[in-house]
Amino acid sequence: MLSRLQELRKEEETLLRLKAALHDQLNRLKVEELALQSMISSRREGEMLPSQPAPEPSHDMLVHVDNEASINQTALELSTRSHVQEEEEEEEEEEEDS
């Protein structure tokens, strides 16, 4: 009974870490989406006003959009099985040391 409770607590911790990682990634994607929407709307405004020359975007106006390489730098471990197994092995080692 106690070991099952410990397993559930470890699983909960793993799921909470996974939730946080996914939440961070979701926030990054939302920021990127807003940046892309801003770029699209500014281009549409430029197309609607062809009589005026398009202003050169200043450095402050440029929106940094993550490229694929920087997005992929964040590795998400969606498989909790390997993490749980590692924790179980660590727990067994601790029990053996006791």
UniProtKB/Swiss-Prot annotation:
Domain of life (superkingdom): Eukaryota
Skewed-composition ranges (Acidic residues): 86-98
Record keywords: Nucleus, Transcription, Transcription regulation
The keyword Ribosomal protein appears for this protein: no
Compartment(s) where it occurs, according to its Swiss-Prot or TrEMBL record: Nucleus
Primary localization class, coarse: nucleus
Gene Ontology terms, MF aspect: RNA polymerase II general transcription initiation factor activity; RNA polymerase III general transcription initiation factor activity
GO BP term, example: transcription initiation at RNA polymerase III promoter
Keyword Repeat: no
Transmembrane segments: none
InterPro entries reported in the protein's UniProt record: SNAPC5
GO cellular component, one term: nuclear body
Region (Disordered): 75-98
Subunit structure: Part of the SNAPc complex composed of 5 subunits: SNAPC1, SNAPC2, SNAPC3, SNAPC4 and SNAPC5. SNAPC5 interacts with SNAPC4.
Function: Part of the SNAPc complex required for the transcription of both RNA polymerase II and III small-nuclear RNA genes. Binds to the proximal sequence element (PSE), a non-TATA-box basal promoter element common to these 2 types of genes. Recruits TBP and BRF2 to the U6 snRNA TATA box.
Official protein name in the record: snRNA-activating protein complex subunit 5
Organism: Bos taurus
